[in-house]
Curated annotation (Swiss-Prot):
Subcellular location: Periplasm
Organism, scientific name: Vibrio vulnificus (strain CMCP6)
Signal peptide start and end residues: 1-19
Alphabetized InterPro entries for the sequence: OMP_Chaperone_SurA (IPR050280), PPIase_dom_sf (IPR046357), PPIase_PpiC (IPR000297), PPIase_SurA (IPR023034), SurA_N (IPR015391), Trigger_fact/SurA_dom_sf (IPR027304)
Root EC class: isomerase
Function per UniProt: Chaperone involved in the correct folding and assembly of outer membrane proteins. Recognizes specific patterns of aromatic residues and the orientation of their side chains, which are found more frequently in integral outer membrane proteins. May act in both early periplasmic and late outer membrane-associated steps of protein maturation.
Gene Ontology cellular component list: outer membrane-bounded periplasmic space
Name assigned to this protein: Chaperone SurA
Gene name for this UniProt entry: surA
Location of the PpiC domain: 170-268, 277-377
GO molecular function: peptide binding; peptidyl-prolyl cis-trans isomerase activity; unfolded protein binding
Length: 428
């Protein structure tokens, strides 16, 4: 089944894309302040049966199938209502991007996609609006479920260690080593201070092999401290214990053993995938709509802030401290610090990824409220050291997200007013 056909099936199950003419005014289910029409259920049933016939898939009997469809419609309606409640809006730009991606994934142009949808009896305008609705529901679900997820640092560390062992098995490191050896009667704190001084010089660019020739008492001192290429399993244990996916050029130490203090340098790495990310330092002002402050009022107030900043009447930081309703950043002149854009909700992420440095955005809305944001700086950061922790976090997040989605949907359903209207009530 093409991707758009899968979406079309969801559309028929969630929104009366094609409605049977006589059934339009027949309410089948009341869901809070919304309704599901019998025509929605009938259309979804016909579509599912037709697709099952084409694919040779067996379906349950009519009563069970009807119950499953009604349950799906109720959950989808509740998710749409949640999106409306927290103010999720999908603008035309994001909608167009999503539909272009659907067309690309099906190797179609937009015109070809539109024609294919029309051949199934659905207008392109209806298709667009249903995709918009499903995007909003998905975004609301993600935002609300994300708040319920708690991942402990120990969970991340434990999984990252397992992943690291699997990945590190084939990685080879070229290691440089400097050993400062204990001698009888020597002040160990003085030796440690010397080791720290050497590390500072190395980090400032001093040549490692020269330092090893000069100071090291280790077994490879006459080779400039060069131990050559080794996998972790081939290294001395005191080396292997310090190697945790660091990248080329990393200086490690000083660390202590029974014979003295050690300094390592990873001269080169083979087989380790490096990870570079862009971090953005931005600042923002957040206003949250209330019964007193409307959406339009929040926009007007933020536009007035922009005018005052440009006129030199106030600084961004002053206004953030005085007015922003994000207490964590307001105290820092609105600054959020260097973060990867993926940490932010989609609308905020889009702004910090696309705004030129030093430019203040127009007011925009997220699930948190109305914002203006300014990008202060961008930087490329090598995250190879933390790549395994990031991967471990994503795995744990996805596991817990899938578990929490089910629980959230059950709670949503349990807390809703749902009334299934029988034939007698409709006829009476």
């Amino acid at each position: 089944m093409n991707i758009w056909k899968t979406l079309l099936l969801g559309m028929l199950v969630t929104g009366s894309a094609v409605s049977a003419p006589v059934e339009l005014d027949k309410v089948a289910v009341i869901v809070n302040d919304g309704v599901i029409l019998q025509s929605d259920i009938d259309t979804a049933t016909k579509t599912l049966r037709a697709n099952a016939k084409k694919s040779g898939q067996a379906l349950p009997d009519a009563d069970v199938l009807n119950e499953q469809i009604v349950d799906k419609l109720i959950i989808d309606t509740l998710q749409t209502q949640e999106a409306d409640r927290i103010g999720v809006r999908i603008d035309d730009t994001r909608l167009n991007q999503a539909i272009e991606e659907i067309a690309r994934n099906n190797n179609q142009t937009i015109d070809e996609l539109s024609a294919a949808i029309a051949s199934e009896g659905v207008s392109y305008a209806e298709f667009r609006e249903q995709i918009r609705k499903e995007m909003a529901a998905s975004e609301a679900r993600n935002a609300l479920v994300r708040r319920r997820i708690n991942i402990l640092p120990a969970e991340v560390d434990n999984l990252a260690e397992l992943l690291s062992k699997e990945t590190n098995a084939s990685v080879e490191y070229r290691i440089g080593h400097i050993q400062l050896r204990f001698t009888d009667g020597q002040d160990k704190s003085a030796l440690e201070a010397q080791a720290k001084e050497l590390v500072e010089k190395l980090k400032q660019g001093a040549d490692f092999s020269t330092m090893a020739y000069t100071y090291s008492k280790g077994p490879k001192a006459l080779q400039g401290g060069d131990w050559g290429w080794m996998r972790k399993e081939e290294m001395p244990t005191i080396f292997a214990d310090q190697i945790k996916m660091q990248n080329k050029g990393s200086i490690i130490g000083p660390f202590r053993s029974g014979v003295g203090f050690h300094i390592l340098k990873i001269e080169d790495v083979k087989g380790l995938e490096t990870v570079a990310v862009t971090e953005v330092n931005a600042r923002h002002i957040l206003l949250k709509p209330t019964v007193i402050l409307s959406d339009e009022g929040a926009q007007r107030e933020l536009n007035e802030f922009i005018r005052r900043i440009r006129a030199g009447e106030a600084t961004f930081g002053e206004l953030a401290q005085q007015y922003s309703q994000d207490p964590g950043s307001a105290a820092q002149d609105g600054e959020l610090g260097y973060q990867t854009p993926d940490l932010y909700v989609p609308e905020f992420k889009h702004q910090v990824e696309t705004l030129p440095v030093g430019t203040i955005s127009e007011p925009f809305k997220t699930v948190h409220g109305w914002h203006i944001v300014e990008v202060l700086d961008r930087r490329e950061v090598d995250r190879t050291d933390s790549a395994m922790k990031n991967k471990a976090y994503r795995i744990l997040f996805n596991r817990k997200f899938n578990e929490e989605v089910g629980a959230w949907m059950q709670e949503l359903r349990a807390g809703a007013f749902v009334e299934i209207i029988n034939e007698e009530e409709n006829d009476g």
